[in-house]
Amino acid sequence: NYMAINTIVAMAPGLAQKVGLGLTEAGLVFSLWFYIRAFAFLKLWLWPGWHYRFGWFLTGLVGLLVSYLVLLTATNIPLLLLSQIGFGWCSALLYYSSLYYAMDGSQSHSEHGGIHEALIGVGICGGPALSSAAQWLTGSPMAPAWAVAGVLAAAVGWVCHLHHRAKSG
């Protein structure tokens, strides 16, 4: 989640230039996902129907991957806006799920809350580090997008594996 967020933040100026946005317009266009994320937090707080439903979490992971890729490859403003709706909603669902399950699903709330925060730190550091390494190694301006997308895809596979193992064992 935070790997994708920080990669988008780093690539936003180039993406804005690609679709012809000036600095002010870029700030407005690229802030949409923050507003969607805030709305999604409120919705998830008020509606408990998503609790302990694997499909919601998996949809958040897959949706984050898809919206991330669309956002980074968008060639027009409407597509940038549409992809941010998905990205904002999915990033909120994943963040809220992580925190909720860390705090609600165990007796050691503070320990699991600390693990949640540590994983955020890994994403904040790891996304830009992986992105920089990918661009340095390949020289391609899109290498950061594909490297982080690979990590997100691996996360989808890992979560599916864990879910399957938990159901069968």
Explain the meaning of each model-derived region.
Residues 109-137:
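A late C-terminal transmembrane helix in Major Facilitator Superfamily
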Residues 55-70, 149:
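Structural signature of the two symmetry-related core transmembrane helices
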Residues 78-86:
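Paired small-residue
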Residues 133-152:
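A membrane-interface helix-boundary motif in multi-pass transporters
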